[in-house]
Amino acid sequence: MAKTLEGKVALVTGAAQGIGLAIVKRYVADGAAVILSDRNDAAGAGQAEALRKSGADVRFVHCDVAEPKQIEALMAASLKAFGRVDVLVNNAAIIDTAGFLDLDLETFDQVLAINLRSYFVLGQAVARQMVAQIKAGSAPGAIINMSSVNDHFALPDHVAYTVAKGGVRQLTRAMAVALAPQGIRVNAIGPGTIVTPLIANVVTDDAVRRRILSRTPLGRFGEADEVASIASFLAGRDSSYVTGETIYCDGGRIPLNYTVPVAG
C-alpha cells in the first residue's frame, strides 16, 4: 500500500516536542521528508538525529517564529535542503497566564507574534512557494494551522492565547478562500486538552484534572498521536475537498452544554 505522503516535503514548526513532534513522526511514517523547526536547538536537533537514525529524512532548522527574518531563513534552509514545500504545519505556540487586568502589552504582543502573526508570515511565504511549484507543474499543497478549542471559548486567565487562537481560526478561513483558486487547501486543527509536556503539571493536579474531565464527554485527555492523525488526513489526498475548516480534537468539549460526572 502506497504511503499517503510519499515524495512530499513537510515543514512543521514548534516540533521539538508534544503535538509538533507527533506530527513529524506521523508524516515520516506517511513517507514524507520533514523539516523539523523549533527555537529549542538541543531538543530539536536531538529529535531530528534520532529520527534519521531510524531511516527518516528529517532536518532540523532553528527558528524563533516571532522574528520574521528567522522565518525567511527557515524558508531558505527548507528550500536548500529539499527544493520544495508541499505541506506546512504552523504549530509553534506559547501560552500566557495573566488575567485581563494584569496582562502587560509586551506579553500580549509576544504571544500574538508567535501564535498568530507567524502563521500569517510563514503561511504567506509557503503559499507563494507552492504557487511557484504549481506553475512548474506540481500538485497544489496543504497548509495546516494549529488552533485550539479556545478559538471558541474565552479564557479570562489566558487572554492573549485566546485572542490569538480566535485569530488563527479566521486566518485559516481567509487563507483558504484566497488560495482556493490555486487549489491550495488551508485547514486548522483545534485540540482540547492533550497530554504533552506543556500541560504535564496540570494533569497531575487532581482538582484540575477532574474539572477538565467534567466538561469532556469522552472522559479522558487526548493524546498527541490523535492530533497527528488529523494532521495526516488534512495533508493527504483523502481531504482533497476539505478547506477552510477547523477540525476539533477535543473529546466532545465544544458541543457540551453541561458537566458530566467523573469517576474516581
Model-assigned labels for residue ranges:
Residues R128, V177-P181, S240:
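Alpha-helical segment proximal to the catalytic Tyr-Lys
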Residues S232, T243-G264:
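Short C-terminal tail/terminal secondary-structure segment
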Residues Q170, A188, A207-D238, V242, ...:
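C-terminal helical subdomain
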Residues G123, A164, T172:
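Active-site helix of classical SDR
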Residues L101, F153-V159, P181-Q182, G219, ...:
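Active-site loop immediately N-terminal to the catalytic Tyr-X3-Lys motif
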Residues G99-F100, D104-L112, I212:
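Substrate-binding pocket helix/loop in short-chain dehydrogenase/reductase
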Residues S148:
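Residue(s) in the substrate-gating loop at a strand-loop-helix junction
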